[in-house]
């Protein structure tokens, strides 16, 4: 008798474990978030977050999130959860970001802090474990940060991961695995992956150049050399510019007044430029010398690069020039499949309706602008007609006054006679 696979795995104790959700925040309970999220008091002028679904959305309630509300401000807000270590298990960090303000410069990333963080004093120099998410500033910076704190030093990824820079909601996912590999996804599609050791400078290089090795003095690494049998032709050297043979001294040229006449110069058609001997293959060429490498005595492998003793706080510690960014659908779990499913059930469900609403607003705005432009032209034409009528009335009035003055003058002349 064949047993179903799930039942068989269960009997063998091999059934997949349920996902562990360490932190999840969707802001579905109105102002309840204010009890879970703590504002830092490190600076008195930190920007304020408000709960909003923005100017356009797929679902007004489901799409509500934390929105930055003040321009040119630093922001510092965090939420605490039960501490856990990712040692021996996968870590997945996921959230959505929406830059509906068409952001010009500002962060859209999160930071994961250890349990020792004082949330009321969180600031830009507070030590964190991981920083992940988009950062935009002008046309030159549109990247996804993936920064790990390793032995007290913040280490940046060696690759450039481009972030989304439009006005719609996007899903960002970071996966860190116990085999020291990682994956970055945007909108549930992989955009980067690889090895932690290869893509970050956590460790000294495995190999270094042998300090005792040097290129031999007789090593010839010239692939081409001058042909020793080649010589410059006798008629090669010609001046680059010559007097114009067709130029003539003007007839009215006065040498006492104008000085000695000199014809203008022109490009010499026989000028050949600098002579260089032709190149031939170097018979002594040995190739490019490669510096020999040796094992780096400073290198020591670390199988626990990925692991942290504890995570306990998720924070939004960032700067924005133009406010309006909305953060939502935060998730920290140990299950990649669950995170993907959660993303599809949140961002995935509302993204199409969000775009439809934005497209409708854009179309309405376009029609409104066209109508305003049309009204402006009509008013301009009406003003022009009014000015023309006014000018005609003034001309008629002037003609009438002139006629009256002429009649008065004629009457006065008649009386004098």
UniProtKB/Swiss-Prot annotation:
Residues 309-417 are annotated as: C-domain. An alpha-D-glucoside binds at residues 109, 111, 128, 135, 317. Residues 1-17 form the signal peptide. Its main location: endoplasmic reticulum. It is found in: Endoplasmic reticulum lumen; Cytoplasm, Cytosol; Secreted, Extracellular space, Extracellular matrix; Cell surface. Residues 207-251, 352-378 have a biased composition (Basic and acidic residues). The modification N6-acetyllysine is found at residues 48, 159, 209. This is Calreticulin. It comes from Bos taurus. The gene is CALR.
């Amino acid at each position: 008798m064949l047993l179903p696979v799930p039942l068989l795995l269960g009997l063998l104790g091999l059934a997949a474990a349920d996902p562990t959700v360490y932190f999840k925040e969707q802001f579905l309970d109105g102002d309840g978030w204010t009890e879970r999220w703590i504002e830092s008091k490190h600076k008195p002028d930190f920007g304020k977050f408000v709960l909003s679904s923005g100017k356009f959305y797929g679902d007004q309630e489901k799409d509500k999130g934390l929105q930055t509300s003040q321009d040119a401000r630093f922001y510092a807000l965090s939420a605490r959860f039960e501490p856990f270590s990712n040692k021996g298990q996968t870590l997945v960090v996921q959230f959505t970001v929406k830059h509906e303000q068409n952001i010009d410069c500002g962060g859209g990333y999160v930071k994961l802090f250890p349990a020792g963080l004082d949330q009321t004093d969180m600031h830009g120099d507070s030590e964190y474990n991981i920083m992940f998410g988009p950062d935009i500033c002008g046309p030159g910076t549109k990247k996804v940060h993936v920064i790990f704190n390793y032995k007290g030093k913040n280490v940046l990824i060696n690759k450039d991961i481009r972030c989304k820079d439009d006005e719609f909601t996007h899903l960002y996912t970071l996966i860190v695995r116990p085999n020291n590999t990682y994956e970055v996804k945007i909108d549930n599609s992989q955009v980067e992956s690889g090895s932690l050791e290869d893509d970050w400078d956590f460790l000294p290089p495995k190999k270094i150049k042998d300090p005792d090795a040097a290129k031999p003095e007789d090593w010839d690494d010239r692939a081409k050399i001058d042909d020793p049998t080649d010589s410059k032709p006798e008629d090669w050297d010609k001046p680059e510019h010559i007097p114009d043979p067709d130029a003539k001294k003007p007839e009215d040229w006065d040498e006492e007044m104008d000085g000695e006449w000199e014809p203008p110069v022109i490009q010499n058609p026989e000028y050949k430029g600098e002579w260089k001997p032709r190149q031939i293959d170097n018979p002594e060429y040995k190739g490019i010398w490669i510096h020999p490498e040796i094992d780096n005595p400073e290198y020591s492998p670390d199988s626990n690069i990925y692991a942290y003793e504890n995570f306990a706080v998720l924070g939004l510690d960032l700067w924005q020039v133009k406010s309006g960014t909305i953060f939502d659908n935060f998730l920290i779990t140990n299950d990649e499949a669950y995170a993907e499913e959660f993303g599809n059930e949140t961002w995935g469900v509302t993204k199409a309706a969000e775009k439809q609403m934005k497209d409708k607003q854009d179309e309405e705005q376009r029609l409104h602008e066209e109508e305003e432009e049309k009204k402006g032209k009509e008013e301009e034409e009406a003003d022009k007609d009014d000015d023309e009528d006014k000018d005609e009335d003034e001309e008629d009035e002037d003609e009438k006054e002139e006629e009256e003055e002429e009649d008065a003058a004629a009457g006065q002349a008649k009386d004098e006679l």
